[in-house]
From Swiss-Prot:
Organism for this UniProt entry: Encephalitozoon cuniculi (strain GB-M1) (Microsporidian parasite)
InterPro entries the record matches: Elf1, T_Elf1_sf
Record bears the keyword Zinc: yes
Cell compartment(s), UniProt: Nucleus
Name of the protein: Transcription elongation factor 1 homolog
Keyword terms: Metal-binding, Nucleus, Transcription, Transcription regulation, Zinc, Zinc-finger
A Pfam family annotated for this UniProt entry: Zn_ribbon_Elf1
GO cellular component, as recorded: transcription elongation factor complex
């Protein structure tokens, strides 16, 4: 008598959602107009609104992404 064969499940990797690169402006409240960039050579993060020309700059490290720069800008706006 033989053993029953066991079906092996094939591991299908889950797709990771992409991080957003365009955000809402905390100054003029337009949607998808803020673009955040991180200059790793300068160790600075920049956020610029294309409608109201508002801008923000902050210090960055090697792990900083665009969402980190945007959240720092929103935190700075909430403090005022």
């Amino acid at each position: 008598m033989g053993r029953r064969r066991v079906k092996r499940r094939i591991n299908i990797p889950k797709r990771q959602s992409r991080l957003e690169k365009r955000f809402n402006c905390p100054v003029c409240n337009h949607e998808n107009v803020v673009q955040c960039t991180v200059k790793k050579t300068l160790m600075k993060g920049f956020a610029n609104c294309s409608v109201c020309e508002a801008s923000f700059a902050c210090d960055a490290n090697k792990l900083t992404t665009g969402i980190d720069v945007y959240s720092a800008w929103v935190d700075e706006c909430c403090k005022r």
